[in-house]
């Protein structure tokens, strides 16, 4: 990232702060006779000054620990609350009779796709710890950006059309915004973007094999109606119980955002962190998949049965290992994105649900078989000539400076 680009993003960041915090002060002062202004205004002032600090500071050793704590605090606060500040601005502007509220809401939802870019560069980029970088990526940044449009519409005085609410609930706009923000952030950390083209050194037959495995699993996972090993590959139900745009976009969102998070950002950071280790690939692949699995534990807090969540953690980890090896060998981030999206879209449309139910005994058996297959494929690609192809691709493309 050039100094000119970074300076431009800093100006964008400061201008965004002035507008959003200014509108918040006005609303506090005018709402209900300003009764909340003394306390709320003081809190907003303190937050605003701390938010301004990263943009105004120069390279210096003073207050080093406090400044770095502030980077984490501002990352959490701004990635979480920026949509609410923007919604407040839209609500205030909509009070002007000559401005259309629905048009303002549409502009606000679109702006949220890029609003986090200056925040990422000014506030999150200075974080140097690999653990810290991964921690903020998989928590505040992912949840804040992907759910930004949904958070934006949380204010009761914004009346959005039903189609706006449907799109915001799917998180698809947030997923696209996450792609943009994380791409810029990793470039700020001096890491290259993901590769899109297939690796010319990879054997075509093996890449085709990965595509076949991904396709076959997507179809079996969604449409197999068998309840035993004798029927699981012979009994099928191809009925789509909820073939709606909402289900399609809800399944597409993790295919984009989660792959961008784990197969691009987290995997690249781990590859960089272990670049001097002999087992660099093993550490990066197995850790990224394990993190991907454990990351799904939060679904238990959303009302999903604990046994279903445990099953999902195991499945997500093994799928993460398979998708990581698929990406590293094929060379294209599109392949794991398409496989992941196909799995989620087809399963959601076929079942009509976005959550998992309590697994029965046979489902635990199929999970065990899935673990054996995906772990076996991962080990296969991390050994022999396949490993050499992956290592060359990592050195020449993913970690090239």
What would you call each of these model-derived segments?
Residues 25-35, 90-108, 119-140, 151-260, ...:
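Juxtamembrane helix-loop-helix connectors linking adjacent transmembrane helices
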Residues 47-65, 115-125, 182-184, 263:
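Canonical alpha-helical transmembrane segments
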Residues 206-207, 282-287, 313-314, 334-338:
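Hydrophobic alpha-helical transmembrane segments
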Residues 2-11, 20-38, 54-61, 331-401:
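C-terminal membrane module of polytopic membrane proteins
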Residues 7-26, 42-48, 71-88, 111-113, ...:
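Alpha-helical transmembrane segments
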Residues 10-12, 34-49, 100-115, 164-177, ...:
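Alpha-helical transmembrane segments of polytopic membrane proteins
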Residues 257-287, 325-332:
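Membrane-interface helix/loop boundary segments of multi-pass membrane proteins
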Residues 1-7, 58-73, 125-130, 191-200, ...:
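Membrane-interfacial, low-structure loops and terminal tails that flank and connect transmembrane helices
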């Amino acid at each position: 990232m050039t100094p000119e680009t970074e300076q431009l993003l800093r100006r964008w960041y400061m201008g965004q702060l002035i507008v959003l915090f200014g509108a918040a002060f006005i609303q506090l002062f005018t709402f209900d006779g300003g009764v909340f202004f003394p306390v709320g205004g003081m809190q907003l002032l303190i937050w605003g000054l701390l938010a301004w600090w990263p943009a105004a500071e120069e390279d210096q050793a003073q207050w080093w620990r406090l400044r770095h704590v502030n980077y984490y605090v501002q990352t959490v606060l701004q990635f979480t609350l920026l949509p609410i500040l923007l919604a407040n601005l839209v609500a205030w502007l909509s009070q002007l009779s000559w401005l259309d509220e629905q048009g303002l809401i549409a502009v606000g939802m679109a702006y949220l796709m890029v609003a986090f870019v200056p925040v990422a560069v000014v506030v999150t980029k200075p974080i140097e710890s690999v653990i810290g970088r991964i921690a903020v990526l998989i928590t505040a940044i992912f949840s804040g950006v992907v759910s930004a449009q949904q958070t934006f519409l949380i204010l009761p005085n914004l009346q959005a059309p039903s189609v706006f609410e449907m799109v915001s609930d799917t998180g698809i706009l947030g997923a696209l915004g996450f792609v943009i923000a994380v791409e810029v952030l990793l470039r700020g950390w001096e890491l290259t973007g993901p590769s899109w083209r297939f690796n010319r050194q990879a054997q075509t037959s093996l890449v085709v094999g990965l595509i076949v495995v991904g396709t076959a699993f997507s179809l079996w996972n969604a449409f197999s109606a068998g309840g035993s090993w004798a029927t699981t590959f012979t009994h099928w139900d191809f009925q789509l119980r909820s073939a709606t745009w909402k289900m399609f976009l809800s399944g597409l969102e993790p295919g984009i955002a989660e792959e961008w998070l784990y197969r691009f950002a987290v995997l690249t950071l781990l590859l960089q962190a272990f670049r001097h280790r002999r087992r660099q690939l093993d550490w990066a692949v197995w850790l990224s998949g394990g993190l991907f699995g454990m990351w799904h534990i939060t679904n238990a807090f959303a009302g999903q049965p604990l046994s279903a969540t445990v099953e999902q953690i195991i499945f997500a980890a093994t799928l993460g290992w398979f998708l990581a090896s698929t990406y590293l060998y094929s060379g294209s981030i599109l392949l794991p994105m398409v496989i992941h999206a196909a799995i989620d879209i087809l399963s959601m449309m076929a079942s009509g649900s976005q959550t998992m139910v309590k697994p029965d005994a046979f489902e635990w058996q199929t999970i065990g078989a899935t673990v054996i297959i995906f772990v076996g494929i991962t080990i296969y690609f991390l050994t022999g000539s396949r490993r050499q192809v992956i290592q060359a691709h990592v050195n020449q493309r993913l970690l090239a400076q």
